[in-house]
Amino acid sequence: MAMKSLSFLAVLSLLALTLPLAIASDPSQLQDFCVSANTSANGVFVNGKFCKDPKLVTADDFFFSGLQTARPITSPVGSTVTAVNVNNLLGLNTLGISLVRIDYAVNGQNPPHTHPRATEILVVEQGTLLVGFVTSNPDNRLFSKVLNEGDVFVFPEGLIHFQANIGKAPAVAFAALSSQNPGVITIANTVFGANPAINPTILAKAFQLNPRVVMDLQTKFKK
């Protein structure tokens, strides 16, 4: 009896340790697919989205067109991201993956940011990029590499990373992310463009800056 109790406790402990790993990413699907539906009509509620009735699903629900064309670059950082996720490709719902195209102007960058729910794997299609990510505290170690056409680099989930065009011509990259909705937290926009604004005194102390400099940055990033 004592041995059975010990075995039960061992199994229970193992489950307790593995459960956080099991829920650390998008949940596994319980059916072949769950095409997201915009309304509850003819649908069921699964994983945060209404699922379209499988009998009404068509090939178009798994199709997106648009990554073949570069979008205009109008951002001050000199890059444009075209995302394909569950919001514009409904068939991605529950499948745990998404895709982006990133266009970089000369000297443009995709500034330091994180994806709170996804690992990213990036391949350069055109140009030369300087890429990198920084590990968590206390080491804050930088892993950086220069990528040319056809080169691939991985950014671990949740870590701050960036890409910068260091070539003499525009650059293009494609990236896959391990979530249907990976999320993006751009560090500068989040810290200095928070709504409502973070108290400048707090940021001045955190960044060792004059409060006036912080207020100037907050003005620049104000939405």
Swiss-Prot record:
Signal peptide residue numbers: 1-24
InterPro entries hit by this protein: Cupin_1 (IPR006045), Germin (IPR001929), Germin_Mn-BS (IPR019780), RmlC-like_jellyroll (IPR014710), RmlC_Cupin_sf (IPR011051)
Protein's UniProt name: Germin-like protein subfamily 1 member 11
Keywords: Apoplast, Disulfide bond, Glycoprotein, Manganese, Metal-binding, Secreted, Signal
UniProt subunit comment: Oligomer (believed to be a pentamer but probably hexamer).
Protein family: Belongs to the germin family.
Job description of the protein: May play a role in plant defense. Probably has no oxalate oxidase activity even if the active site is conserved.
Glycosylation sites: 38
Compartment(s): Secreted, Extracellular space, Apoplast
Keyword hit for Metal-binding: yes
Binding site for Mn(2+): 113, 115, 120, 161
Name of one Pfam family that matches: Cupin_1
This protein's record includes keyword Chaperone: no
Organism: Arabidopsis thaliana (Mouse-ear cress)
One example GO MF annotation: manganese ion binding
Entry GO terms, CC: apoplast
Domain of life where this protein originates: Eukaryota
PANTHER family noted in UniProt: GERMIN-LIKE PROTEIN SUBFAMILY 3 MEMBER 3
Main subcellular location of this protein, as a coarse class: secreted
Cupin type-1 domain mapped to chain residues: 65-215
Disulfide bonds: 34-51
